[in-house]
Amino acid sequence: MGEVVTKSGGAVHTGGQPLEVSKDGLRFFPGAGAVIGPLNALVNWGRAGSIWPVTFGLACCAIEMMATGAAHHDLDRFGIIFRASPRQADCMVVAGTLSKKMAPVLRRVYDQMPEPRYVLAMGSCACSGGLFQSYAVTQGVDQVVPVDVYVPGCPPRPEALFDGFIRLQEIINKEQMRWSPWR
């Protein structure tokens, strides 16, 4: 019941409960278990609501990253579940200082992730090299892999990582679907 959507995009009331319309144009039919909307919006809604990051903890920021998965903060309630394998993940959280010797390993893990893939740089060291201005330290993860979201701080609190994931969800919701994985 509720409303019927016409070809012009307007909704005609037919009685019963009204439709719930989200900000991205999806129409939810309460009680019917149905969703109507553009294909991009439906796919992005599903992908943004179920981010599966692989952790790449390199230093003290990794402790704060682990705290976000613990009971007090609980990332699972947002649909964010840490994965053990990059082949099952769609996001990589790089937390800490990236040495030049570790850079090829980071690139290899990134290449093993399926498309679409995202990178979240957590902490000052991952964002810009931090205090370690050295010949042995990469000055930012973005020199090795493309970074989508930067979470600054030394170390950033779990709430800052939450904010980074929310920004990543906003990026995912604005994307257009790619029909070919080979581009």
Swiss-Prot record:
Cofactors required: [4Fe-4S] cluster
Q: How is the cofactor bound?
A: Binds 1 [4Fe-4S] cluster.
Q: At which positions is [4Fe-4S] cluster bound?
A: C60, C61, C125, C154
Enzyme Commission number: 7.1.1.-
Query: What membrane topology does this protein have?
Result: Peripheral membrane protein
Tell me where in or outside the cell this protein is found. Cell inner membrane
- Gene Ontology terms describing biological process: aerobic respiration; electron transport coupled proton transport
Alphabetically list the UniProt keywords.
4Fe-4S, Cell inner membrane, Cell membrane, Iron, Iron-sulfur, Membrane, Metal-binding, NAD, Quinone, Translocase, Transport, Ubiquinone
GO molecular function per UniProt: 4 iron, 4 sulfur cluster binding; iron ion binding; NADH dehydrogenase (ubiquinone) activity; NADH:ubiquinone reductase (non-electrogenic) activity; quinone binding
The reactions it catalyses are: a quinone + NADH + 5 H(+)(in) = a quinol + NAD(+) + 4 H(+)(out)
Q: Which GO terms describe its cellular component?
A: plasma membrane; respiratory chain complex I
Task: Give the enzyme's main class according to its UniProt record, as a single word.
Answer: translocase
- Which InterPro entries does this chain map to? NADH_UbQ_OxRdtase-like_20kDa, NADH_UQ_OxRdtase_20Kd_su
Superkingdom to which the source organism belongs:
Bacteria
Family matches, as Pfam families:
Oxidored_q6 (PF01058)
Q: Which SUPFAM superfamilies match?
A: HydA/Nqo6-like
Q: How does it assemble?
A: NDH-1 is composed of 14 different subunits. Subunits NuoB, C, D, E, F, and G constitute the peripheral sector of the complex.
Free-text function comment from the UniProt entry: NDH-1 shuttles electrons from NADH, via FMN and iron-sulfur (Fe-S) centers, to quinones in the respiratory chain. The immediate electron acceptor for the enzyme in this species is believed to be ubiquinone. Couples the redox reaction to proton translocation (for every two electrons transferred, four hydrogen ions are translocated across the cytoplasmic membrane), and thus conserves the redox energy in a proton gradient.
Which PANTHER family is this protein grouped with? NADH DEHYDROGENASE (PTHR11995), NADH DEHYDROGENASE [UBIQUINONE] IRON-SULFUR PROTEIN 7, MITOCHONDRIAL (PTHR11995:SF14)
The similarity comment for this entry is: Belongs to the complex I 20 kDa subunit family.
Could you identify this protein by its name? NADH-quinone oxidoreductase subunit B
